[in-house]
């Protein structure tokens, strides 16, 4: 692995770290404090539902960002688009840390919060897809799973950083946490913005896009063409996202709220358990990715989805014991094994599903449409289901099983791609 490959993997990881740091601190703040700061006129359960609704709003902006920046990424190149998306996500998050609360400006506070959430979502719509494509299109044959996993590793780094920062500030006295402590994680995002901009400005354009540009073969309408030429692949991505993205937000966001507010567990204990699970995922994500380079994307992805379906009910039984070691083990099995087993091979798999001229548009658009169905509404729906079940988690567990089973079905009907030529135009091959 030479220096250029290392730069590519760092560039891939740092943007994903920023995106998911930003999104996780928002989700954590929504679970812990936003109901008091931005929706104080409502009872605690309604305020929490409204907080999670603002969390979901950003996901509705993601497909539009995916379509616009995916179009640009297939037209002008992967690198310039990745610099733009990095800045949009980072600046939106930093500004949330400067927002006045409802006590200061009334209804304008949640309006500004939702606006910045939309900015975050718009930029994030093409961030992860572009980071993956940057890595996969630079990868040597037979190592696309490993190279693509660096974007996924960046996700876990971002989640780990976010959890760690929130664990520190949540240990403050409640008055300090509500007055200024919650702002610190958002303001610290400026560090990742600066580092990410420096690294991405030094990385080269991918060899695949360079060949397309040299032959003047860039697609005129890549988003429309991707929908028309890859309908099966779009459906596979949508289905594959249900469990990976839905459970990926339920475990750290909804269950954080459930364990602290319904079970009365300490925030620091739960956050430390989540942080441990993501630390272990730094190793399990590339492990599952490398395994997918050897045996294929579908067996690894589908196997992890089945595991997640089987583990949904045991997860809540383990959490319900109130025992720290058992709760931490539940989080490790759910996040480091079940979710990482899907997330690891996903990067290369989604990139390989689409041909080079439409890859960015197809990947970003399909993936972020999946976000609307999965991660965006997941905490809100889980909170609503919890209320419908008299604060017992079994309806939530059934929802999780449903997501995982649908993902397993989508993977079963999807094509295997780990031996495909990354330069081949699959749409042309179909005709």
Where are these regions (language model features)?
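Extracellular/periplasmic helix-loop-helix junction of adjacent transmembrane segments
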Residues: 30-62
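Cytoplasmic membrane-interface "Motif A"-like loop-to-helix N-cap segments
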Residues: 75-86, 294-305
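Glycine-rich segments within core transmembrane alpha-helices of 12-TM secondary carriers
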Residues: 145-170, 366-378
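Helix-loop-helix hairpin linking two adjacent transmembrane segments in secondary transporters
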Residues: 155-200
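C-terminal transmembrane helical hairpin of 12-TM major facilitator-type secondary transporters
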Residues: 299-345
């Amino acid at each position: 692995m030479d220096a250029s490959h290392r730069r590519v993997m760092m560039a891939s990881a740092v943007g994903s770290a920023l995106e998911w740091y930003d999104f996780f601190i928002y989700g954590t703040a929504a679970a812990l404090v936003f109901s008091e700061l931005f929706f104080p006129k409502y009872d605690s359960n309604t305020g929490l539902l409204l907080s999670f609704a603002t969390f979901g709003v950003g996901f509705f902006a993601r497909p539009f960002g995916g379509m616009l920046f995916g179009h640009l990424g297939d037209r002008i190149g992967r690198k310039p688009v990745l610099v733009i998306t990095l800045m949009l996500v980072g600046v939106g998050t930093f500004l949330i840390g400067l927002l006045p609360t409802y006590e200061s400006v009334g209804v304008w506070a949640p309006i500004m919060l939702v606006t910045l959430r939309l900015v975050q979502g718009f930029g994030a719509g093409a961030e992860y897809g572009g980071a993956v494509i940057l890595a996969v299109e630079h990868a040597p044959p037979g190592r696309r799973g490993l190279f693509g996993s660096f974007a996924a590793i960046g996700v876990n780094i971002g989640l780990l950083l976010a959890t760690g920062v929130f664990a520190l500030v949540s240990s403050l006295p409640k008055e300090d946490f509500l007055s200024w402590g919650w702002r610190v994680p958002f303001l610290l995002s400026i560090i990742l913005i600066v580092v990410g901009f420096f690294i991405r400005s030094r990385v080269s354009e991918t060899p695949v896009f360079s060949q397309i540009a040299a032959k003047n073969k860039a697609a005129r309408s890549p988003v429309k063409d991707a929908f028309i030429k890859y309908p099966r692949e779009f459906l596979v991505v949508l289905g594959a996202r249900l469990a990976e993205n839905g459970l990926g937000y339920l475990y750290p966001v909804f269950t954080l709220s459930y364990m602290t507010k319904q079970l009365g567990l300490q925030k620091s204990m739960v956050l430390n358990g989540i942080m441990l699970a993501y630390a272990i995922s730094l190793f399990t994500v590339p492990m599952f990715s490398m395994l997918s380079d050897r045996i294929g994307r579908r067996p690894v992805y589908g196997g992890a989805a089945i595991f997640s379906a089987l583990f949904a009910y045991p997860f809540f039984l383990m959490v319900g014991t109130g025992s720290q070691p058992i709760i931490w083990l539940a989080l490790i099995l759910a996040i480091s094994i079940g979710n990482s087993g899907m997330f690891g091979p996903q990067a290369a798999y989604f990139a390989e599903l689409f041909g080079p001229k439409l890859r960015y548009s197809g990947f970003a658009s399909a993936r972020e449409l999946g976000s609307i169905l999965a991660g965006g509404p997941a905490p809100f729906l889980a909170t609503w289901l919890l209320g419908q079940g008299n604060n017992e988690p079994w309806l939530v567990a059934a929802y999780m099983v449903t997501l995982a089973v649908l993902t397993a079905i989508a993977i079963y009907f999807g094509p295997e791609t780990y031996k495909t030529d990354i330069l081949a135009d699959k749409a042309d091959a179909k005709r």
